[in-house]
Amino acid sequence: KCDEYMKAVIIKAIAPYGFKRFHRLYSEGTASRNTDMRIACVRALGFLADPADEHTLLTAAKDREWVVRSAAIKGLQKLGTPAAIQGVKEATKDKEWWVRQAAAYSLIDMNVNISEIEDVLGGYDKYASDAVKYALYRSVNLKED
């Protein structure tokens, strides 16, 4: 039998190829106690971009480990569903800078309606607003004054 560390390594290697036949393994792995396994499986589900995984990715976006949350946000970006957009917007308020940045870039890359971005920019969370502003500046090559 293969231990969880090795499974995670293998999943990380094959995930970009989008093999749907491993979907069940990925789904089950998102509930693992092993952080590396959760990260690998959430990323793998993101590569599959199956709307059926929306709930799983939204749940992973609230994981205790920031790397899992960040991977979930990138997966939600690929879904682009209304719930995924809302999940990405919520992640701009994450306590971890890296997750806020991933969410900000994901929100912009999702080609959402400008009102979705304005919601974050005009919201009460300064850090969320700053993350989106920074991502906007970077995505259109504007210079900050």
Which stretches of residues belong to each language-model region?
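Amphipathic alpha-helical scaffolding segments comprising HEAT/armadillo-like alpha-solenoid repeats
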Residues: 1, 18-31, 50-62, 81-93, ...
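Conserved hydrophobic register position within alpha-solenoid helical repeats
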Residues: 10, 41, 72, 103, ...
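Alpha-solenoid helical repeat scaffolds
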Residues: 1-16, 22, 27, 34-35, ...
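Ankyrin-repeat and related helical/solenoid repeat scaffolds used for protein-protein interactions
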Residues: 66-112
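Alpha-helix N-cap/helix-start positions at coil->helix boundaries
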Residues: 4-5, 35-36, 51, 66-67, ...
